[in-house]
């Protein structure tokens, strides 16, 4: 066999396997939602992606890394050479183990850390455990999220409001605070925002508010740490096929079946389509001049309509 043939990369597989489009099977799950029970299974492998060692030698922490966007990001980070710690809830242990196997199949280390990000002490502990395992922390991805669809604001209870804010924005602030105690110049903090934080969502008042707060805090923190050589950015996805929506009690199985059909591209994103944006923002080779940015990956939706 010639060298030319041996060195030729494989053809991308995605063109032969189009991303799934609605309608999907009608389905519902209890919170927090389990990826292995979703039909169809979300795609996270990004088989057509070609890694280039952009994160070689880095240590990353990804909250909500057991499933959805977090899993896809954690696995792609590993493919780019990073060791990865992932945070998850007790009910998500099975999904977390699948993520661990996927990371270790890339020859990288994976640390599973179980706990509740609504608790301030755990936000400190998850960072401390990551540093103890890998000796450092170069990349923080604050990704775990909670949502409650409501027909009206009056339906939203104080308990639901507090859990959404504690999970989505308080945890981000606390994780960043803990991470900055050990991060050095060249490190990167990335948060998962949402189209709802830019355009709003009448059915997700508290969730949208937290995502808007994430955008504001990202821009503020970026200014705060720019002199330390640490970059802070966010990714704002449109609809993504993850367990988050089928596990929302306010989302009927019939709505899940049509999920993502109302965006211009006509379908929800697969997690593997979001992960490269996080690699881009984590990599100093790609985005050393980018900080304080909310990168929109929204399937054609724009703030201008």
Predicted regions and their residues:
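Short C-terminal tail/terminal secondary-structure segment
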Residues: 4-7, 38, 46-47, 150, ...
């Amino acid at each position: 066999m010639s060298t030319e043939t041996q060195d030729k990369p494989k053809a991308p597989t995605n063109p032969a396997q189009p991303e799934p489009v609605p309608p999907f099977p009608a389905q519902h799950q209890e919170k927090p939602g389990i990826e292995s029970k979703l039909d169809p299974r979300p795609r996270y492998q990004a088989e057509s992606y070609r890694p280039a060692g952009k994160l070689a030698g880095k240590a990353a922490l990804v909250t909500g890394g057991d499933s959805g966007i977090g899993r896809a990001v954690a696995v792609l980070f590993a493919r780019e050479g990073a060791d990865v710690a992932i945070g998850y809830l007790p009910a998500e242990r099975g999904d977390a183990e699948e993520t661990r196997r996927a990371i270790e199949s890339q020859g990288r280390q994976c640390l599973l850390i179980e706990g509740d990000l609504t608790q301030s002490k755990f936000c400190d502990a998850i960072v401390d455990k990551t540093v103890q395992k890998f000796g450092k922390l170069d990349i923080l991805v604050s990704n775990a999220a909670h949502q409650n669809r409501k027909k009206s604001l009056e339906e939203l209870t104080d308990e639901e409001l507090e859990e959404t804010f504690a999970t989505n924005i308080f945890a981000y602030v606390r994780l960043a605070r803990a991470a900055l105690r050990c991060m050095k110049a060249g490190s990167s903090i990335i948060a998962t925002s949402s189209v709802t934080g830019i355009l709003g969502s009448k059915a997700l008042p508290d969730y949208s508010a937290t995502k808007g707060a994430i955008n504001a805090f990202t821009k503020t923190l970026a200014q705060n740490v720019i002199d330390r050589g640490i970059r802070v950015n966010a990714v704002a996805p449109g609809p993504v096929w993850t367990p988050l929506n089928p596990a929302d009690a306010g989302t009927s199985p019939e709505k899940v079946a049509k999920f993502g059909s109302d965006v211009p591209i006509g379908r929800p994103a697969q997690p593997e389509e979001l992960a490269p944006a996080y690699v881009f923002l984590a990599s100093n080779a790609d985005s050393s001049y980018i900080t304080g940015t909310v990168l929109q990956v929204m399937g054609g939706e724009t703030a201008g309509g």
